[in-house]
Swiss-Prot record:
<dbReference type="GO" id="GO:0061513">
    <property type="term" value="F:glucose 6-phosphate:phosphate antiporter activity"/>
</dbReference>
<feature type="glycosylation site" description="N-linked (GlcNAc...) asparagine">
    <location>
        <position position="53"/>
    </location>
</feature>
<feature type="transmembrane region" description="Helical">
    <location>
        <begin position="88"/>
        <end position="108"/>
    </location>
</feature>
<dbReference type="InterPro" id="IPR036259">
    <property type="entry name" value="MFS_trans_sf"/>
</dbReference>
<keyword id="KW-0325">Glycoprotein</keyword>
<dbReference type="GO" id="GO:0035435">
    <property type="term" value="P:phosphate ion transmembrane transport"/>
</dbReference>
<feature type="transmembrane region" description="Helical">
    <location>
        <begin position="462"/>
        <end position="482"/>
    </location>
</feature>
<dbReference type="GO" id="GO:0005789">
    <property type="term" value="C:endoplasmic reticulum membrane"/>
</dbReference>
<feature type="transmembrane region" description="Helical">
    <location>
        <begin position="434"/>
        <end position="454"/>
    </location>
</feature>
<dbReference type="GO" id="GO:0015760">
    <property type="term" value="P:glucose-6-phosphate transport"/>
</dbReference>
<feature type="transmembrane region" description="Helical">
    <location>
        <begin position="19"/>
        <end position="39"/>
    </location>
</feature>
<keyword id="KW-0256">Endoplasmic reticulum</keyword>
<feature type="transmembrane region" description="Helical">
    <location>
        <begin position="145"/>
        <end position="165"/>
    </location>
</feature>
<dbReference type="InterPro" id="IPR020846">
    <property type="entry name" value="MFS_dom"/>
</dbReference>
<dbReference type="InterPro" id="IPR044740">
    <property type="entry name" value="SLC37A1_2"/>
</dbReference>
<feature type="transmembrane region" description="Helical">
    <location>
        <begin position="210"/>
        <end position="230"/>
    </location>
</feature>
<keyword id="KW-0762">Sugar transport</keyword>
Length: 501
């Protein structure tokens, strides 16, 4: 007598072959970009170790510093009064290189095999991250060394974002893209959390390991990427996704056989069959200025400039702010700052889900940006009154600040990179993603720089700067929000309501 089919086998059979491959790509690209962000985070945790008040530390017998020197345990050249400017310069060496490199990276991403491009980028990123940490073991105290390493790391890290968004866009169509990418985009926060926790283990001892360990993990992930990444569904005989929501858009003529779900599936399989029999003609890669002409690219790019300014200022300066204002240790401040990223995960998922249901990407971003401004104001004034208020405010601020940032860099970029105005004639995903994220990275460079310059005048002024940037990000979306409201009015006047996603 045979037993019934094992429950685990039923689970495997419940999903199609295409679904398993899509799940693999989603998981792999999630881990890839989590590693990229993990390798960026240690600098924000180690800052409070590079410059610290040493009055309560026990000075070694052979130390040559004067008895009145309260900075003897800090790491030169960050042991002087201008340490904030120097640390801001190190941050900006990475961010400016990243912003410049991003515009170039998208062009290469459209023209080079993504698997090779990503693998090489991760290996080099792991190398440069480790070299920063080796400065501790090699006893390097020259500012130029840390700046050069940050510039090189910023350039090679630009290989990541356009490539992973392009890869996910190749596998997933527009339906539920916001929700799927909202969950997937939590890799940013997961990477930040891992980077904070790993760096926190060694920050009070051998802080060089705070960089070396994430660097090694990133390099290993680069090898895994080379072995397993699949760029296109057609490469493994899977059906390509449908962009622009064709089935819903063609419901006006349901009797047309070409508009049925079956015919769409068959046409996709026909494409796969043709590609498997012989080489398919590759569509031409879009030019930089051609990508700028896609409706919405300029507005969302400029919005992201200010949204990312706010997000990256928190990324690089939040642990130091918590340590200075709430008087936590470097490790405690780093651990507490991870709650901002926890909020970012929630905010990204909520933003994707709401924008899918309403079909209003710009409106979703605008509403969250409007709510973020008063929340940042409240966090600055009451966020450090107690541990409970700090936890709650960090999660709320993280969700409202990172939600729009996550939505623009994922679902919006993928939507615009496969925009119907392209008519399927151009490969634009990587270039559009690079333009949007590259413009945002200019803000990411400006934010920490301005924070470093403004913070000596008081943390209140830093928060006023962040609130101003948040309001500007919101205003830049006004035209697109107006268009979405008009579209909803037309939809409601026809009695159709919102489309079901």
């Amino acid at each position: 007598m045979r037993s019934s089919l094992a429950p685990g086998v039923w689970f495997f059979r419940a999903f199609s072959r295409d679904s398993w491959f899509r799940g693999l790509i989603l998981l792999l690209t999630f881990l890839i970009y989590a590693c990229y962000h993990m390798s960026r985070k240690p600098i924000s945790i180690v800052k409070s170790r590079l410059h610290q008040n040493c009055s309560e530390q026990i000075k070694p017998i052979n130390d040559t510093h004067s008895l009145n020197d309260t900075m003897w345990c800090s790491w030169a050249p960050f042991d002087k009064d201008n340490y904030k400017e120097l640390l801001g310069g190190v941050d900006n060496a990475f961010l400016i290189a990243y912003a410049i490199g991003m515009f170039i990276s998208g062009v290469f991403g459209e023209r080079l095999p993504l698997r090779y491009y990503l693998s090489a980028g991760m290996l080099l990123s792991g190398l440069f991250t480790s070299l920063f940490g080796l400065g501790y073991f090699w006893n390097i105290h020259e500012l130029w060394y840390f700046v050069v390493i940050q510039v090189c790391n910023g350039l090679v890290q630009t290989t990541g974002w356009p490539s992973v968004v392009t890869c996910v866009g190749n596998w997933f169509g527009k339906g539920k893209r916001g929700f799927i990418m909202g969950i997937w985009n939590s890799h940013t926060s997961v990477g930040n959390i891992l980077g904070s926790l790993i760096a926190g283990i060694w920050v009070n001892g051998q802080w060089g390991l705070s960089f070396i360990v994430p660097g090694i993990i990133t390099a290993v992930m680069g090898v895994i990427t080379f072995l397993f990444l699949i760029e296109h569904p057609e490469d493994v005989d899977c059906a390509p996704p449908q962009h622009h929501g064709e089935p819903a858009e063609n419901q006006d003529n349901p009797e047309d056989p070409g508009n049925s779900p079956c015919s769409i599936r068959e046409s996709g399989l026909e494409t796969v069959a043709k590609c498997s029999k012989g080489p398919c003609e590759e569509p031409a890669a879009i030019s930089f200025f051609g990508a700028l002409r896609i409706p919405g690219v300029v507005e969302f790019s400029l919005c992201l400039l200010f949204a990312k300014l706010v997000s990256y200022t928190f990324l690089y300066w939040l642990p130091l702010y918590i340590a200075n204002v709430a008087h936590f240790s470097a490790k405690e401040a780093g651990d507490l700052s991870t709650l901002f990223d926890v909020g970012g995960i929630i905010g990204g998922i909520v933003a994707g889900l709401v924008s899918d249901y309403t079909n209003g990407r710009a409106t979703t971003c605008c509403v969250m940006l409007i709510l973020a401004a008063p929340m940042m104001f409240l966090y600055n004034y009451i966020g450090q009154d107690g541990i409970a208020s700090s936890i709650v405010m960090l999660i709320i601020c993280g969700g409202l600040v990172n939600g729009p940032y996550a939505l623009i860099t994922t679902a919006v970029s993928a939507d615009l990179g496969t925009h119907k105005s392209l008519k399927g004639n151009a490969k634009a995903l990587s270039t559009v993603t690079a333009i949007i994220d590259g413009t945002g990275s200019i803000g990411a460079a400006l934010g920490p720089l301005l924070a470093g310059l403004i913070s000596p005048t008081g943390w209140n002024n830093v928060f006023y700067m962040l609130i101003s940037a948040d309001v500007l990000a919101c205003l830049l979306l006004c035209r697109l929000v107006y268009k979405e409201i008009l579209a909803w009015k037309v939809s409601l006047s026809r009695g159709s309501g919102y489309k079901e996603i």
